[in-house]
């Protein structure tokens, strides 16, 4: 954006699984940089990881039981860093009912919070639930078509306008 290669009206971000953490934090810290973002099967409530099926991440991310590690987990926790009265970019947040790594309530909880605080005139927060696991299923191509159709729609690609 600074070098004029693009603008915020043409920029989208996608974060999958743990990649949803940096993308989610970028959206929270610099919402004005993005028109849209996709957070796909992402762990969005890191303070609660150890109380889920994803508790194997304790050696990687830390534990909320240690005060220093708690502070790091809080700093990267999407849900707890969502601010009131902010115009966030349009978001598509996905979760899978049978995800063996990310419990379905994590993306759902974050989507509900984004919907609660979003003040954008054209802001869209969608929560899409599938029934496969963390790595998708045989309908993965359809899922990706849905995901990219959302992003192109939000980026005002004329081929993806609603009719």
Which residues fall in each region the model found?
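Active-site-proximal cap/loop segments of hydrolase catalytic domains
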Residues: 1-163
């Amino acid at each position: 954006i600074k070098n004029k290669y693009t603008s915020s009206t043409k920029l989208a971000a996608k974060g999958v699984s743990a990649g949803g953490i940096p993308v989610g934090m970028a959206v929270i810290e610099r919402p004005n940089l993005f028109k849209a973002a996709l957070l796909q099967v992402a762990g969005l409530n890191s303070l609660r990881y150890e109380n889920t099926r994803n508790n194997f991440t304790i050696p990687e991310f830390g534990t909320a039981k240690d005060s220093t590690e708690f502070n790091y987990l809080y700093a990267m926790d999407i849900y707890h860093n969502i601010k009131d009265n902010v115009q966030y970019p349009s978001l598509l947040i996905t979760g899978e009912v049978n995800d063996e790594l990310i419990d379905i309530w994590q993306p759902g909880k974050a989507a509900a919070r984004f919907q609660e605080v979003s003040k954008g005139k054209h802001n869209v927060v969608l929560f899409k639930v599938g029934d496969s696991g963390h790595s998708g299923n045989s309908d993965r191509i359809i899922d990706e078509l849905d995901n990219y159709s959302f992003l192109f729609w939000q980026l005002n690609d004329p081929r993806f306008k609603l009719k």
